[in-house]
């Protein structure tokens, strides 16, 4: 990077491991400025529990970004609504979590931050607080007024994007329409080029049905919907291979010649990726007007404040965000 950049981090659920992981991030120097949108006392208390040094530096958007020294974080303060006790969810803090996400998102939209990295939230407690919340992806899509976003998870070796996300199985076949596939593949192709620096992305596309429909004997969605869309997009120059049976696609024969996989639904593509690299994976939201990465795990309430949480996924998410910033410059 030609000059230091500034990214914003949201720790997520205050009773979970998110604050622990953010404190652990601070134990090394970073070539970018890490602005944490959180309650300062929460981070200080959690650092003391973990026995780790932490100094909080004031955030000033008018001061040029600078590399982050080890043992420090730059604080963009948002106040807790109630005390946060490790491992104990508090409905009163649901609005706090949403406020951190909103402030971080708005900062990316107005150019304050080059990327957003999110820690794990607890969707249930946010909804229990009376705030409808499906997840980070949908929240940022709505707040940024993005036309459409695509969820992609990645490890060092594998990228898997999803045509549909949090839908029950009985609804998926109806959701796989030509319009949806055109939109999802266009976003995936565009962001692989612009945010990952891949000049001509090669995308493997899963079929929907077992054996990719077996020529129509196990479902006709491939023949009626998926194949016509892929043919149209290939004619435009996209490098698409599929539809392929999901049970044989995830092997070196195919993956060695691909930059990403498009799965038709959540549990078709993600079990393979998480088996291969759980704890090292990153969740990326494609289609947003800014870079957003996230850890691939939950709040792990039982580990909060105990010094046993693994910071690996957070480090990977932050490093990937840095690479994506470089690719977009």
Curated annotation (Swiss-Prot):
Cellular-component GO terms for this entry: cytoplasm
Cellular location(s): Cytoplasm
Protein's GO biological process: pyridoxal phosphate biosynthetic process; pyridoxine biosynthetic process
Pathway: Cofactor biosynthesis; pyridoxine 5'-phosphate biosynthesis; pyridoxine 5'-phosphate from D-erythrose 4-phosphate: step 4/5
Chief location: cytoplasm
Record keywords, A-Z: Cobalt, Cytoplasm, Magnesium, Metal-binding, NAD, NADP, Oxidoreductase, Pyridoxine biosynthesis, Zinc
Cofactor entry: Zn(2+); Mg(2+); Co(2+)
Family annotation (SUPFAM superfamilies): Isocitrate/Isopropylmalate dehydrogenase-like
Binding site for substrate: 136-137, 274, 283, 292
Enzyme class at the top of the EC tree: oxidoreductase
Additional comment: The active site is located at the dimer interface.
Family label: Belongs to the PdxA family.
Protein name from the UniProt record: 4-hydroxythreonine-4-phosphate dehydrogenase
